[in-house]
Amino acid sequence: MRSPQTSEKTHTMAKTLQNITDLTLQQLTGRLAEMKEPAWRAKQIHEWLFSHRAESFEEMTTLSKALRKALEETFAITPPEVEQHDNSTEGACPGPTEKLLLRLPDGAMIETVLIPGPGRLTACLSSQAGCALQCSFCATGSLGFKRNLTPGEITGQANALNSMLAASGREQKITNIVFMGMGEPLLNTLNVFDAVETLSTRGYTSSISQRKITISTVGIIPEIAKLATSGMKTKLAVSLHSAFQEKRESLMPLAARRYPLDELQPVLAHYAKNTGEPVTLVYMLLEGVNDTLEDARQLIRFASRFFCKINLIDYNSIVNIPFQSVCSETRDRFRDRLLEAGLQVTLRKSYGTSIHAACGQLAAKGMEHSNKS
């Protein structure tokens, strides 16, 4: 962790200089052309930033001193600072679930999570500080919306997780990314798209195929339409939680009213048809709320009209939020009804509940210290 003096200096620089990690390779190439530098320099610098995770231009020893000085006068490098590192090993999980509380240069706090699985290591990234959507089962919504994250603040989370792995001597590599952390990715679409472009750039030791990156949304219809024609190869997950409009409004009041199911369904069908990829419908089972066979039948009616798969997930307990998870018998009965209808269904196990790292639990623990200098 950097010293307070370093943090203060970095924050001051960030006020006047652009964070170079906010730039995609193409954007950096354009900026360097203005500095009369060849295009290949951009790839060289990006490799320092995202393969070697350099935190200063002085570390970029393959660049001339003159260029390093010019870069230092033009750009800043402002990685997030790790405020807290929690880990938890649970049940059949093949390794520890780890959560980092990160401080951004302006003092905003976010969380990112590393989730192990059989043959994979998934990074759960945040796209916003806080969230404006106020979903009733989600801790992040209780924070309110602070601001969108920049592309560099998004990729910086992956860098922080990779640095954590390297510091512990592990040779593991992040294999998958899910935008299921704090915030709504499709209310920060351009920055998320730029971050995906950087994270998936071939040739970096940390690069990840876009096919292994999932963007999760509450169902922002115009942005899903953009994603369908963007040419990106990412996967799409939609937080559904009920196929009854009125019930969905009670769970997700802002998103469900603004983007009703009868308008969302055809857009998801268009996405699936245009991309050839299934939409993942995420359905959190809540005891006595959305767990009946009638709920299952309504979900079948909604999901049978387009190429999709369904992830059933358990509710993860959150302080002051009065929902309960369903028992295994209820969950299995619900799943079996979907399977009988010919739908593809997966029961997703959540890990990291004891450290508040599971779905819906991210609330930037330590947010009360976000004004610390």
Curated annotation (Swiss-Prot):
* Enzyme Commission number(s): 2.1.1.192
Names of required cofactors? [4Fe-4S] cluster
Q: Give, as one word, the top-level EC class.
A: transferase
Q: Pfam families, per this entry?
A: Radical_SAM, RlmN_N
The highest taxon in the source lineage is: Bacteria
The cofactor note reads: Binds 1 [4Fe-4S] cluster. The cluster is coordinated with 3 cysteines and an exchangeable S-adenosyl-L-methionine.
Record has Iron-sulfur as a keyword: yes
* Annotated localization: Cytoplasm
What cellular component terms from Gene Ontology apply here? cytoplasm
Where along the chain is S-adenosyl-L-methionine bound?
Answer: 183-184, 216, 239-241, 316
Which catalytic reaction applies to this protein?
A: adenosine(2503) in 23S rRNA + 2 reduced [2Fe-2S]-[ferredoxin] + 2 S-adenosyl-L-methionine = 2-methyladenosine(2503) in 23S rRNA + 5'-deoxyadenosine + L-methionine + 2 oxidized [2Fe-2S]-[ferredoxin] + S-adenosyl-L-homocysteine; adenosine(37) in tRNA + 2 reduced [2Fe-2S]-[ferredoxin] + 2 S-adenosyl-L-methionine = 2-methyladenosine(37) in tRNA + 5'-deoxyadenosine + L-methionine + 2 oxidized [2Fe-2S]-[ferredoxin] + S-adenosyl-L-homocysteine
What GO biological process, any one, is recorded here? Answer: rRNA base methylation
| Residues noted as binding [4Fe-4S] cluster in the record, renumbered to the chain | 131, 135, 138
Q: Which UniProt keywords apply?
A: 4Fe-4S, Cytoplasm, Disulfide bond, Iron, Iron-sulfur, Metal-binding, Methyltransferase, rRNA processing, S-adenosyl-L-methionine, Transferase, tRNA processing
List cystine links.
124-359
Q: What NCBIfam families does its record include?
A: rRNA_mod_RlmN
Q: Know the name of this protein?
A: Probable dual-specificity RNA methyltransferase RlmN
